[in-house]
Regions:
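Rossmann-fold dehydrogenase core element
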Residues: 101-119, 137-144
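Contiguous beta-strand/loop segments that form the cofactor/metal-binding neighborhood of enzyme cores
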Residues: 1, 169, 175-210
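N-terminal Rossmann-like dinucleotide-binding module
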Residues: 1-44
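Residue-level detector of anion-binding/catalytic polar loops
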Residues: 30, 86, 113
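Predominantly a Rossmann-like dinucleotide-binding segment in NAD(P)-dependent oxidoreductases
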Residues: 120-187
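Beta-loop-alpha module in the N-terminal Rossmann-like domain of NAD(P)-dependent dehydrogenases
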Residues: 46-88, 92-106
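Short, Asp-centered acidic motifs that coordinate Mg2+ and/or phosphate
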Residues: 31-32, 62-63, 141
């Protein structure tokens, strides 16, 4: 019998509002929300919390979807895994390799799901690209360009404090390309970044050789 998992959504981010909640409702997935900033009733949520710790204690959820600012991903992910929840984290899952390795060790030890959420790979253009590559296995070079509209001045994407910037926002896409399209072993990489006056990365170029 297929289990109907309950999801606790921690954080009421743009992606949560625009994509996650409507998907949960459409797919009839039981979910509740923990948000410190949003107090109004959220359609479809079986329960709402204004405190993350209370939500983790009382939600009755099986899976946590973490959708907080980048700088908060690691400490909350570590806590959530230690409490025994399966965990999905908005990209980037962490901002440092050492932090990621810690989370992986905890998840393996406790036999829990730990994954980073990306959405771009479900776009119709990627379905087309995968189909195209499947018919042309002699491809030697792939050029990919990810761009987004300029964020608003108060956006967390432009916040040094919350570990924003282009690299944190877009590098999970870059890292996922090979896994999605080729599944080859990485042999060499080089990265060039451009920073603004606040030392925030605003663009970057990556060369990956497989």
């Amino acid at each position: 019998m297929k289990k109907n998992y309950k999801i606790l959504l921690i954080g009421y981010s743009n992606i949560a509002r625009k994509r996650l909640i409507q998907t949960f409702v459409k797919k009839k997935i039981p979910f509740c929300v923990a948000s410190k900033s949003f107090k109004k009733k959220i359609k479809g949520s079986y329960q709402q919390f204004n405190d993350y710790n209370q939500a983790l204690k009382n939600s009755g959820a099986d899976i946590v979807y973490l959708s907080l600012p980048n700088s908060m991903h690691f400490p909350w992910s570590k806590k959530i895994l230690k409490l025994g929840y399966h965990l999905i984290v908005d990209k980037p899952i962490t901002t440092k390799v050492g932090e990621l390795n810690q989370l992986i060790r905890i998840a393996k030890r406790k036999k829990l799901l730990l994954t980073e959420a990306t959405f771009f790979n479900y776009h119709n253009q990627f379905k087309f690209v995968k189909k195209f590559i499947g018919k042309h296995r002699n491809i030697e070079q792939v050029f990919v360009n990810f761009t987004i509209p300029m964020p608003k001045k108060n956006s967390l994407l432009l916040s040094q404090k919350f570990h924003g910037g282009t690299f944190m926002d877009m590098s999970p896409y870059t890292a996922s390309i090979n896994r999605i399209l080729f599944e080859e072993k990485l042999k060499k990489k080089s990265i060039i970044v451009k920073k603004n006056i606040q030392k925030l990365i605003i663009s970057y170029d990556v060369f990956l050789k497989y």
